[in-house]
């Protein structure tokens, strides 16, 4: 399920990923924007990636091998919709067995930690990809244009 809904195949001059593949068109704050590459589709294997946790430690998707993993990807905790999604995932994650919910954004780990602490969120794992371009390259989610250019499109 995508938070920013793809409306059609990318047209015009959308972004391109490192392999030169065209991105997808999404609606961001009522304006068309393009992702840096094609988004993963249901059934595709999620590529491994590196991110930073609240302790400034590098983590990878493979660190959670053997567990079910839900990726909640969003532009920033400083947007109401993204903050709400993290709160809702936290509430639902409490009842999930052998499952981790990774809330991934380009927010700095300090901001993510402060948000989760202030909100009392302890059932999700906030991860920052602020220095990890492999994530945005492999997942095709970086916004190549539009009002939030440079951040990531929302995706689950």
Please describe what each predicted stretch is:
Residues 2-156:
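Chalcogenol-based redox active-site neighborhoods
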């Amino acid at each position: 399920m995508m938070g920013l809904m793809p409306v059609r195949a990318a047209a015009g001059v959308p972004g391109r990923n490192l392999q030169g593949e065209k991105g997808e068109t999404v609606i961001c704050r009522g304006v068309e924007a393009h992702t840096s590459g094609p988004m993963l589709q249901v059934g595709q294997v999620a590529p491994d990636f590196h991110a930073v946790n609240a302790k400034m430690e590098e983590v990878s998707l493979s660190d959670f091998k053997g567990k079910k993993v839900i990726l909640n990807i969003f532009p920033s905790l400083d947007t109401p919709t993204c903050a709400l999604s993290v709160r809702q995932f936290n509430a639902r994650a409490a009842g999930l067995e052998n499952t981790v919910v990774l809330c991934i954004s380009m927010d700095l780990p300090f901001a993510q930690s402060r948000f989760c602490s202030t909100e009392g969120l302890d059932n999700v794992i906030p991860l920052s990809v602020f220095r990890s371009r492999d994530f945005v390259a492999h997942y095709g989610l970086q916004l190549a244009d539009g009002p939030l250019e440079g951040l990531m499109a929302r995706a689950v």
